């Protein structure tokens, strides 16, 4: 969680997640080599999510209360950026991470909230939903050249977090990307010459000027994804040129 109110370091948490998965995979492979084993151990990454907003609130709960409002984190926009990056991390490791269940789905540290009078989507719902719908197929070994920054906890962290997923059956390619810079838009180029005949279907962006912006029952669409303008992404001669706004989650879909 972002206890220190340090967004730069908070967004680098996905690098810690990436390093953790790589470390566990390395240990599994080292034991396999030492034992001359043939079985590859795959991973389950269980009960993941951002969780810290409700900690202080829950300390005030009385004991033995019926159906208390417990662990009801209200997620803000920067949480959505991190969840988007965590999903990218899990996709990058899809060769070994075969199951990755989000902790809970409704009310308790969840993307969906309810009350006695309604239900609404939290900020983290959108990268989760869109990645689930369009992040299907074969995860490509996405080589990303990006500037880095020094985070307080995780060392060097990339400004650009990205992965590509190819759906061969539907002749569709989806690019997921997070620009973690808090100050600058990012111009990105991507070599897609192997995807001849593909065209941009849509460029979806999740962004907000206020990193602390939240969705509530009264304002359920304060933070929602929108279609980026045509000037934000173009594909010519097998080269994709795109602009990712500062502190934004992006999804570019291409298809024949």
Range-by-range predicted roles:
Residues 1-87, 93, 144-158:
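Noncatalytic carbohydrate-binding groove/subsite architecture in carbohydrate-active enzymes
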Residues 1-7, 49-55, 106-112, 151, ...:
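Flexible loop/turn segments at secondary-structure boundaries
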Residues 24, 47, 100, 128, ...:
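Conserved, mostly hydrophobic/aromatic
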Residues 98-172:
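Glycan-recognition and catalytic regions of carbohydrate-active enzymes
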Residues 157-197, 203-208, 250-251:
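Carbohydrate-binding surface patches
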Residues 177, 239-242:
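Beta-strand-rich interaction surfaces with strong enrichment in secreted/lumenal proteins
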Residues 196-240:
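Acidic, Ser/Thr/Pro-rich beta/coil linker or hinge segments at domain junctions
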Residues 243-254:
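Short Pro-Gly-centered flexible turn/kink motifs
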């Amino acid at each position: 969680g972002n206890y220190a109110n340090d967004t730069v370091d908070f967004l680098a948490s996905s690098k810690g997640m990436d390093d953790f998965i790589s470390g566990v995979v390395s240990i599994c492979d080292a034991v396999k080599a030492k034992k001359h084993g043939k079985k590859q151990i795959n991973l389950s990454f269980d009960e993941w999510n951002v969780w810290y907003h409700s900690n202080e609130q829950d300390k005030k709960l009385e004991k033995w209360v019926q159906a208390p409002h417990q662990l009801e984190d209200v997620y803000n926009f920067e949480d959505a950026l991190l969840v988007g990056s965590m999903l990218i991390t899990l996709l990058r490791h899809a060769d070994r991470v075969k199951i990755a269940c989000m902790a809970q789905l409704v009310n308790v540290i969840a993307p969906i909230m309810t009350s006695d009078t309604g239900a609404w989507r939290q900020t983290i719902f959108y990268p989760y939903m869109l990645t689930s719908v369009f992040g299907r197929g074969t995860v490509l070994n996405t080589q990303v050249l990006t500037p880095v920054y020094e985070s307080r906890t995780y060392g060097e962290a990339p400004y650009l977090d990205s992965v590509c997923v190819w759906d061969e059956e539907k002749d569709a390619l989806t690019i997921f990307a997070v620009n973690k810079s808090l100050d600058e838009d990012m111009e990105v180029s991507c070599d897609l010459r192997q995807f001849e005949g593909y065209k941009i279907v849509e460029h979806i962006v999740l962004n907000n000027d206020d990193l602390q912006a939240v969705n509530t029952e009264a304002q359920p669409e304060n933070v929602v994804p929108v279609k980026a303008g045509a000037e934000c992404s173009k594909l010519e001669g097998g080269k994709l040129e795109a602009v990712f706004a500062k502190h934004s989650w992006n999804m570019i879909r291409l298809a024949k």
